[in-house]
């Protein structure tokens, strides 16, 4: 059995969770699923349940393309906003491994400013 690697980008904010699968270079998109595509209510888009179902859906799409191993990049909103990933990040990673996808490395890709713009109001 051939071992084909992919790269899963998980963007987990407090409003939504987006899973995006690319090849190892990150140039070619293989599949993309968000929490909003899974649940009806807008308040549930960022929930762990929506992230888990999105991860199961993405695992099926990856298996169809022949990808069975992935590296994971987790990203929060970052910048001047929250640098902590939302509630869906951990649930998505756990669901991917439960779906039979082998996980290589997990890294944090949250953008952190090196003294960027002035924060607004209370954060100054």
Curated annotation (Swiss-Prot):
Record-level Gene Ontology MF annotations: rRNA binding; structural constituent of ribosome
Matches recorded under SUPFAM superfamilies: Translational machinery components
Top-level taxon: Archaea
Keyword list, A-Z: Ribonucleoprotein, Ribosomal protein, RNA-binding, rRNA-binding
Single GO biological process annotation from the record: translation
This protein's record includes keyword Ribosomal protein: yes
One GO cellular component term noted in the UniProt record for this chain: ribosome
Region of interest called Disordered, as start-end residue ranges on this chain: 102-124
Keyword rRNA-binding: yes
PROSITE patterns: RIBOSOMAL_S11
Gene3D superfamilies: Ribosomal protein S11
InterPro entries referenced in this protein's UniProt entry, alphabetically: Ribosomal_uS11, Ribosomal_uS11_archaeal, Ribosomal_uS11_CS, Ribosomal_uS11_sf
Quaternary structure note: Part of the 30S ribosomal subunit.
PANTHER family linked: 40S RIBOSOMAL PROTEIN S14/30S RIBOSOMAL PROTEIN S11
Family as reported in the entry's similarity comment: Belongs to the universal ribosomal protein uS11 family.
Functional note: Located on the platform of the 30S subunit.
Name of this protein: Small ribosomal subunit protein uS11
